[in-house]
UniProtKB/Swiss-Prot annotation:
Lineage: Bacteria, Bacillati, Cyanobacteriota, Cyanophyceae, Synechococcales
GO cellular component: outer membrane-bounded periplasmic space; plasma membrane-derived thylakoid lumen
SMART domains per UniProt: PDZ, TSPc
Catalytic activity: The enzyme shows specific recognition of a C-terminal tripeptide, Xaa-Yaa-Zaa, in which Xaa is preferably Ala or Leu, Yaa is preferably Ala or Tyr, and Zaa is preferably Ala, but then cleaves at a variable distance from the C-terminus. A typical cleavage is -Ala-Ala-|-Arg-Ala-Ala-Lys-Glu-Asn-Tyr-Ala-Leu-Ala-Ala
Principal cellular location given in the protein's record: other
Species the sequence originates in: Synechocystis sp. (strain ATCC 27184 / PCC 6803 / Kazusa)
PANTHER family: CARBOXY-TERMINAL PROCESSING PROTEASE CTPA, TAIL-SPECIFIC PROTEASE
Descriptive protein name: Carboxyl-terminal-processing protease
Length: 427
């Protein structure tokens, strides 16, 4: 992605997940007050990097003059001015992260949080706060909250009055405390009240097991809940163990995975792919860059990938790469549809700013933003609990097992096909 060292993030979650590039401190402007310097630093980062060169069809320089002339008497007024300036872009992923929020975003990729376990997003079409995905085993998942459910209020506060980070902060809190959410489920007209008890949310991203339930066949199951800093290492370790245990094929579960570190997603794709393109990125100049697999895949055994409406961002990059390269069969429901990349810049006072800098396309140049990825085999999943994942009630998982043991899942396209499956091209 360039000559400078960059750390790839993916947007959360606050949990808002997408693809983020960490770039560190940037020089402040001179000959201004400290508050003006911070505002100008934020303005300049957007001016230099923002994907839309029209800045939502407005004069970005005039906005600079407007906000730098505003009296900025303290840091809170400066943050408010920056947030108002960014809001004129009418794009929810470009946003200010105050120091605590910036720190929390970093923590979510490596540690644990006390909250209800929801990744959230502001729908750019409705401007409504909605659920991207509940974390596996979280209070939110146990309560049955689903992707695209709208969050109308948090403890009685209308979410239309809250920023994304303010909403996230209200849902976090000490363990065993309660928070009330007013939820409008997709396809319904009457909101429901949910009272959830906050718990420590483990961010360990991988669960794996060998499934011997089908006679004569062993299927390795890997569930990846997010692309955190240790995701690649844990997936690689799980894959190595399952290979040693004699797995004949694999199910990679990306359901309700809202994304994570972009580099982790690319590295995990390389575990499965032969030499091939993983993803293209396109910046505001139209310059296209690509990430590729090096041809050193860890296995060439048949692979099925489970996806649903909560599969977003970096998860869609991985799923799209495996589908477009005919390496895997996708099973489940259409994915979320987030195809934008944000760079995360650290500001001079310890705050941060996320700026949408690029969009991505799958290896076959599909732009999935707001469209999602359609699986090869559409299987709708009735509501199940976390404990029922991989059980007979998990019809998507059972469909994946059927594909693997019935002989229609995709194996490494350049290798001999194991007896467990025959290769086919996705429809």
């Amino acid at each position: 992605m360039g000559k400078r060292t960059r750390r790839f993030w993916a947007l959360a979650f606050s949990l808002l997940m997408g693809a983020l590039i960490y770039l560190g401190n940037t020089p402040s402007a001179l000959a201004f007050t400290e508050e003006q310097k911070l505002l100008l630093q934020s303005w300049r980062l957007v001016n230099q990097s923002y994907l839309d060169e029209t800045f939502n069809h407005q004069n970005w320089w005039l906005l600079r003059e407007k906000y730098v002339k505003r009296p900025l008497r303290n840091r809170e007024e400066t943050y408010t001015a920056i947030e108002e300036m960014l809001a004129t872009l009418d794009e929810p992923f470009t946003r200010l992260l105050r120091p605590e929020q910036y720190g929390n975003l970093q923590v979510t990729t490596t540690g644990e949080l006390s909250g209800v376990g929801l990744q959230i997003n502001i729908n750019p079409e409705t401007n409504q706060l909605e659920i991207m995905a509940p974390l596996a085993g979280s209070p939110a998942e146990e309560a049955g909250l689903q992707p695209h459910d709208q969050i109308l209020a948090i403890d009685g506060v209308d979410t239309q009055t809250l920023s994304l980070d303010e909403a996230a902060a209200r849902m976090r809190g000490p363990k065993n405390t309660k928070v009330s959410l007013e939820i409008l489920s997709a396809g319904t007209e009457v909101p429901q009240e949910f009272t959830l008890t906050r718990q420590l949310i483990s961010l360990s991203p991988v669960a794996a097991q060998l499934d011997d339930s089908r006679p004569g066949q062993s299927v390795g199951y890997i569930r990846l809940s997010q692309f955190s800093a240790n995701a690649y290492k844990e997936v690689a370790h799980a894959l190595h163990q399952l290979e040693e245990q004699g797995a004949d094929g694999y199910i990679l579960d990306l359901r309700n995975n809202p994304g994570g570190l972009l580099q982790a997603g690319i590295d995990i794709a390389r575990l499965w792919l032969p030499e091939s393109t993983i993803v293209y990125t396109v910046n505001r100049q139209g310059t296209q860059e690509s990430f590729t697999a090096n041809g050193e895949a860890a296995t060439d055994r048949p692979l099925v990938v489970l996806v649903n409406q909560g599969t977003a961002s970096a998860s869609e990059i991985l799923a799209g790469a495996l589908q477009d390269n005919q390496r895997a069969t996708l099973v489940g429901e259409k994915t979320f549809g987030k195809g934008l990349i944000q760079s995360l810049f650290e500001l001079s006072d310890g705050a941060g700013i996320a700026v949408t800098v690029a969009k991505y396309e799958t290896p076959q140049h599909h732009d999935i933003h707001k469209l999602g990825i359609m699986p090869d085999e559409v299987v709708e999943q009735p509501l199940i609990s976390f404990a029922e994942i991989t059980s007979p009630a998990d019809v998507q998982y059972q469909a994946a097992l059927d594909l693997l043991t019935g002989g229609v899942a995709i194996a490494h396209k350049s290798s001999s096909i194991p007896a467990m499956a025959t290769a086919h091209k996705p429809n």
